[in-house]
Amino acid sequence: MGKTQSLPILITGGGRRIGLALAWHFINQKQPVIVSYRTHYPAIDGLIKAGAQCIQADFSTNDGVMAFADEVLKSTHGLRAILHNASAWMAEKPGAPLTDVLACMMQIHVNTPYLLNHALERLLRGHGHAASDIIHFTDYVVERGSDKHIAYAASKAALDNMTRSFARKLAPEVKVNSIAPSLILFNEHDDAEYRQQALNKSLMKTAPGEKEVIDLVDYLLTSCFVTGRSFPLDGGRHLR
């Protein structure tokens, strides 16, 4: 990452799972990290102790997004990268107003990265050719669609499209790409039957874990040429 290594990497939703693994990966590389979190999981205390700057944020409103952006602007003169990992998962189901489901999914997956990319643009610029990055975390369902999570899939598709628009806007100083994962790791409460059904959906029949994501993120950060692209992490699921 060269001369920009002293600049922090911002990870939204960094308190658990993939976001947390990414935060520790960079900390272990002596790379400064800023993490947003909504709920104070015990892991946040560990990140703070290790030197990460952890900022509590509520992305459910635009005011909350902009308040977080203001905190970032106060805390650093530049950013090495923004990793938009914060996510929510809502299904269309009886009792859940459809307007609320759609608004929630669009707020976290579209409004939040859109507003943050604009608000923090000046922190990414001025560091040299292809010296900064934005990475959007989308989803495998962008390609396939989902009959049970229509609003979720639509919001992730919008984020995928924004990848190309921001790549055009911010080049050549900032590279903008997206990662579209399917199953990466299970939740602790997932039972054996569910796990096997999920594994059978891909050709590779495995949940690769966070390292697969970390390796791809590292590739995108070190590339000086790749921008405006989406990278599937689906184990060949599209061929099933």
Curated annotation (Swiss-Prot):
It catalyses: (6S)-5,6,7,8-tetrahydrofolate + NADP(+) = 7,8-dihydrofolate + NADPH + H(+); 7,8-dihydromonapterin + NADPH + H(+) = 5,6,7,8-tetrahydromonapterin + NADP(+). InterPro entries: NAD(P)-bd_dom_sf, Sc_DH/Rdtase_CS, SDR_fam. SUPFAM superfamilies: NAD(P)-binding Rossmann-fold domains. The keyword Oxidoreductase applies. The active site is at 152 (proton acceptor). Its EC number is 1.5.1.50, 1.5.1.3. Keywords: NADP, One-carbon metabolism, Oxidoreductase. CDD domains: PR_SDR_c (cd05357). It holds the Pfam family adh_short_C2. One of its GO terms (molecular function) is dihydrofolate reductase activity. GO terms for biological process: one-carbon metabolic process. It comes from the Bacteria. Catalyzes the reduction of dihydromonapterin to tetrahydromonapterin. Also has lower activity with dihydrofolate. Belongs to the short-chain dehydrogenases/reductases (SDR) family. FolM subfamily. This is Dihydromonapterin reductase. It comes from Escherichia coli O1:K1 / APEC.
